[in-house]
């Protein structure tokens, strides 16, 4: 499973190059970029499933898996913003949250592994759906209403991104307080 995660990380720059190579037009490279993104993000569930099924869940996997998601989605947000298809403020808000949580994961890794929480997983699914819709050049096939659908899915993804970031912070503050309370000697009155 860790090998799958590493391949997902390595697919990210290939995806970004294909997305940007022809200026983001609706040609073959855009379609291939979208397919690579969708396959790479979809394998997120596969590596986790295999790790649990064969009982080979590792701390490295818990650390690398969310990083693979962040690299893939981060490249997609950046690429869409470079192409002018997504406002930069959305990309910046998402990247601040993603980089912040990732840096925190590395800071606390010697103390404990900050595994993905349910809201973080929901956020990743919402981002994957919104980004997949934004990456697929469907406007020629189904019409301009796809932009409205993508706006709704992107809004949901951004709200969940912010909410899950807040959830991680609140959870970690509570856990830190509990660890301090457990480590400090009790006082008898």
Model feature map: region roles:
Residues 1-189:
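Alpha-helical transmembrane bundles and membrane-interface segments of multipass inner-membrane proteins
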């Amino acid at each position: 499973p860790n090998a799958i995660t590493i391949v997902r990380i390595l697919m990210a720059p290939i995806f970004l190059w294909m997305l940007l190579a022809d200026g983001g037009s609706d040609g073959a490279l855009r379609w291939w970029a979208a397919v690579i993104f969708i396959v790479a993000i979809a394998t997120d569930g596969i590596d986790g499933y295999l790790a649990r099924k064969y009982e080979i869940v590792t701390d490295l996997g818990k650390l690398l898996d969310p990083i693979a998601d962040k690299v893939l989605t981060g490249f997609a947000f950046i690429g869409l913003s470079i192409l002018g298809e997504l406002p930069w403020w959305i990309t910046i808000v998402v990247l601040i949250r993603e980089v912040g949580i990732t840096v925190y994961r590395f800071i606390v890794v010697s103390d404990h592994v900050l595994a993905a929480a349910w809201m973080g997983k929901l956020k990743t699914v919402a981002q994957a759906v919104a980004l997949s819709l934004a990456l697929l050049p469907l406007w020629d096939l189904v019409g301009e209403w796809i932009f409205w659908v993508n706006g709704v899915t992107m809004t949901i993804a951004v709200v969940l991104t912010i909410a899950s970031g807040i959830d991680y912070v609140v959870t970690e503050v509570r856990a830190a307080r509990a660890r301090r309370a457990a480590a400090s000697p009790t006082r008898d009155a």
